[in-house]
Amino acid sequence: MLTKKEQRLRRSRQTRIRIATQGVARLTVNRTNLHIYASVISGDGTKVLAAASTAEVEVRKEIGASGKGGNVAAAQAIGKRIAEKAKAAGVEKVAFDRAGFAYHGRVKALADAAREAGLQF
């Protein structure tokens, strides 16, 4: 019997295999209790084109005095920031890799904010 974490990692591997066959850049998300991380990785998986996280000093100033990166507002800020960085790197279309996390809460907020900022997926 697989633990919850093993199940999530298994889903993540299967998703990455499917995305790799598409050959487009992927927007990958990692979520911890304190922070949320997002990066855009090239279609062949060898290069990070853009990255953003709530651990960055500029983002912590933007999300408020508390500096908490583990909430929906912080995820929205990261979604907007990663979309801006990806567009600056010349990436318009990505595949969304949620790394096995449920499409709910912070993950959904990040995805919606990235879409609103102009990324297509």
From Swiss-Prot:
Show the GO MF annotations: 5S rRNA binding; structural constituent of ribosome
Signal peptide boundaries: none
* Highest rank taxon of the organism: Bacteria
Which Pfam families has this protein been placed in?
Ribosomal_L18p
What processes in GO biological process is this protein linked to? translation
Key words of the record: Ribonucleoprotein, Ribosomal protein, RNA-binding, rRNA-binding
GO CC entries: cytosolic large ribosomal subunit
Q: Does the keyword Ribonucleoprotein apply?
A: yes
What the entry lists under InterPro entries is as follows:
Ribosomal_uL18_bac-type (IPR004389), Ribosomal_uL18_bac/euk (IPR005484)
Q: Which SUPFAM superfamilies match?
A: Translational machinery components
What protein family is recorded? Belongs to the universal ribosomal protein uL18 family.
Describe the function of this protein: This is one of the proteins that bind and probably mediate the attachment of the 5S RNA into the large ribosomal subunit, where it forms part of the central protuberance.
Binding partners and assembly: Part of the 50S ribosomal subunit; part of the 5S rRNA/L5/L18/L25 subcomplex. Contacts the 5S and 23S rRNAs.
Q: Which PANTHER family match?
A: 39S RIBOSOMAL PROTEIN L18, MITOCHONDRIAL, LARGE RIBOSOMAL SUBUNIT PROTEIN UL18M
What is the recorded name of this protein? Answer: Large ribosomal subunit protein uL18
